[in-house]
Amino acid sequence: MIDKSFWQGKRVFITGHTGFKGGWLSLWLSEMGATLKGYSLDAPTSPSLFDTASISSLMESEIGDIRDFEKLRNSIASFKPEIIFHMAAQPLVRLSYKEPIETYSTNVMGTVHLLEAVKQVGGIKAVVNITSDKCYENREWVWGYRENEAMGGYDPYSNSKGCAELVASAFRSSFFNPRDYANHGVGLASVRAGNVIGGGDWAEDRLIPDILRSFENNQQVVIRNPHSIRPWQHVLEPLSGYIVVAQNLYTDGAKYSEGWNFGPREEDAKTVEFIVDKMVTLWGEGASWLLDGQNHPHEAHYLKLDCSKAHMQLGWHPRWALVETLGRIVKWHKAWINGSDMLEYSKREIHDYMTTTTFS
């Protein structure tokens, strides 16, 4: 499990630190005493977690494009990190239909650039490559996908994440092979999570942010696909897994250099309709929703992960049930509306998670 003392003084480089997941990861690692540098485009939304929780006060922050190889390599070389989390991405399915070139250049070539920089700079012990559960070839069957399933992806976003996994696999085989770990000393793992939700997400075309925007403006929530099932989980759930993977890569890179799934309990893979109904109840007065009957680009209807390997080999398990998570999201958002100090509020959220010892 997470070892807070391990992170004290560790030099950690994070791409995509201005994003939703990147902001939460930066805050968590800072709380454990890590020395951080982030490399990313400006925060993708306004407002954003990065700004509302003052994440920039916790770390060195460089604004740069993952597609600019020279700038990225120089940024890494000047910081001399021990551990890298690669989160920078174009993360939206529907945007990938409109901007496929940007999606592939960011998600695929961005990964190539990051791993080539690691190879050239040297001195890095652990690289955690964050992709997505959508990297798998989705057969829309009832079983969870295991780490050795085929990569795929129907839409440009999902396919780009499958490609990013293949890039990581090729670099691992060619340059960071576990069998040759004694010579190169680099542990490289890929981590895959489902639909991550939590306070501080204002992205377009995501269910929870769309719901909260509508509630905040006293508008009905318009739902596209009420029967779609997603593996919903609080953002701290997979991040805790990524952190544990990094710890293990650092101490035994050869053993843990592979793919890892991080998803919720099976009973928390719920429909969109379940989510919006719960959110309506939690928000209270004035909240409601309606069905949008228009045609929309294809989105997979069912995809879940088999996380048995993470359970058995990492001791990782989810801590917060979906209903607990939804309640925390509403409270976080209302605290922001009411002008609370969201850095301190978010620190307390992490503390609550760290001190949850049984599933709640």
Enumerate the predicted regions with their spans.
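Residue-level recognition of oxygen-bearing side chains
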Residues: 71, 102, 109, 207, ...
